[in-house]
Design a protein with these regions (language model features):
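Bacterial Sec-dependent N-terminal signal peptides
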Residues: 1-26
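Sequence/structural signature of beta-propeller domains
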Residues: 20-290
Length: 290
């Protein structure tokens, strides 16, 4: 957490250079409730078997089921594996993919995604495969901080990663196979996200991708990508929405493709203190009807 705060303070002089988007009055955000201390570092959200889940971002990996009406923890599952900086969980029909690829300073050489079969999870057999990877173009020095990553989604036979670029305030999309092994990620495209991308939610039925993030002042934003050709998100129609409620937004999930849940990490700096929270937002008025 302190590393993130330090980087934010370092980037404050760049604020006048950042592109601005417009906050919309009809963007309805509902604060569900505060999150418990066990998940105040929440970095991801996902639905599984009708329940909303998050997990801790380091140490012994545990899953926490959250009550969607209160944000309270309903149950806890200890997966028996340690993670260094877990930032995202995505899934397909058969597997969960745990993204241990957080890298604030761009120095890690052990980036990986842990794969767990849903059938094993339900049987309480926690056997993980590993998808290890590196970036083909990772910079050195301060620019290495453009290779942090907190957003990933599974589509077809691939995993799509969106970097969190502390220096350029943009994001680059990379792709990996979903099968265990060691890979060099393939670079697809770069786009100006107007801030730090921290979560991804792909709607398979409507072929829509929603990215979550926050800008240099910690204001959350959403980037909706639609009308793209196949998996070429670079050609998508993009709409960026500012969210007036909350700070450092970290995880996003939807069960129906209309109402989205997202989380805010706990934040404390000088005289500013914010508890971790679960929020809910209705995006029906901002997405194309399919």
């Amino acid at each position: 957490m302190m590393k993130k705060i330090a980087l934010i303070l370092m980037l404050l002089p760049l604020m006048p250079m950042l592109a601005q988007s417009v906050a919309l009055d009809n963007l309805q955000v509902h604060r569900v409730g505060s999150l418990a201390k066990e998940v105040e570092g929440t970095s991801t959200l996902f639905f599984l078997d009708g329940r909303l889940w998050t997990c801790n971002d380091h140490g012994q990996l545990r899953l926490f089921a959250l009550d969607t009406l209160t944000g309270h923890i309903d149950s806890v599952v200890d997966l028996g594996v340690k993670v260094y900086d877990l930032e995202e969980v995505t899934q397909d029909d058969r597997y969960l993919y745990f993204g241990d690829f957080g890298d604030n300073n761009g120095v890690r050489n052990d980036l990986c995604i842990l794969r767990l079969a849903k059938s094993d999870l339900r049987k309480k057999r926690y056997r993980f495969d590993t998808i290890a990877f590196s970036y083909p173009d990772r910079a050195s020095g301060v620019l290495a901080r453009n290779f942090d990553c907190e957003a990933c989604t599974a589509i077809g036979d691939s995993l799509y990663l969106f970097t969190k670029q502390w220096i350029s305030q943009g994001s680059t999309c990379y792709v990996l196979p979903k099968t265990p092994g060691r890979y060099v990620a393939k670079r697809l495209f770069h786009f100006s996200s107007r801030g730090l991308v921290t979560g991804a939610c792909y709607l398979h039925g409507s072929r829509c991708l929603v990215l979550l993030g926050y800008n240099i002042t910690l204001q959350p934003f959403l980037c909706i990508l639609e009308d793209f050709d196949g998996k070429s998100f670079g050609s998508a129609r993009r709409l960026t929405l500012d969210i007036s409620l909350g700070t450092q937004a970290e995880g996003i999930a939807s069960r129906d493709g209309r109402n989205f849940f997202f989380t805010n990490e706990a934040f404390e700096l000088a005289f500013v203190s914010r508890k971790a929270a679960l929020q809910k937002i209705d995006l029906r008025g901002f997405m194309k009807k399919k």
